[in-house]
Amino acid sequence: MKQAMPRWTSNDAATAAAYGELARLHGPFVLVAHSQGCNFAWTMALAHPQQVRAIVAIEPSGFPQVGDAALAPLRSIPQLMVWGDHLDGHPLWSQLRPRLRAFAQRLRQCGARVDDWDLPGLGVYGNSHMLMMDDNSEDLALRIDRWLADQGLMVQPAQS
């Protein structure tokens, strides 16, 4: 099996509260989220847009269920969605991915920059749902770093 997605829905309130506390105590920051965590990242960005410089959503499995007008706080936050292999043959992903593409289009319509990377379409193959654990994870991290740099968000480390 190349795609699996565990679901923990009983801790949604605690997770949302933790994201809110993160926004209150720290920031600004770039949110890098995966799967179920992407919904929390977007929800937190809606509540605290001044704290979020960008969102990187790796194989997102959900998004905030809000109207188009409520998406306005996200218009100044660049966003990247990253998709790996083996999605088309999985019943859940064949339903989720079109919904996420529609969500990305709604974000664009409100003025947000949303880049959508289909890794196989970019010539990158062999990824599971856990892209950060795959053999090419370092290459993917470098690609994301370049995307962040293109947004003006990378800070060069101090020379020792």
What does each of the following model-derived ranges do?
Residues 1-10:
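Cap/lid segment of the alpha/beta-hydrolase catalytic domain
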Residues 124-126, 130-160:
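Catalytic active-site module of serine/aspartate enzymes centered on a nucleophile-bearing elbow/loop
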Residues 57-119:
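The feature captures the conserved acid-bearing segment of alpha/beta-hydrolase catalytic domains
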Residues 24-25, 33, 72-75:
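Extracellular/periplasmic catalytic domains that process cell-envelope and extracellular macromolecules
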Residues 9-30:
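Conserved acidic catalytic loop of the alpha/beta-hydrolase fold
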Residues 32-41, 45:
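Gly/Ala-rich beta-loop-alpha elbow adjacent to hydrolase catalytic centers
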Residues 31-32, 55:
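Conserved alpha/beta-hydrolase fold motif
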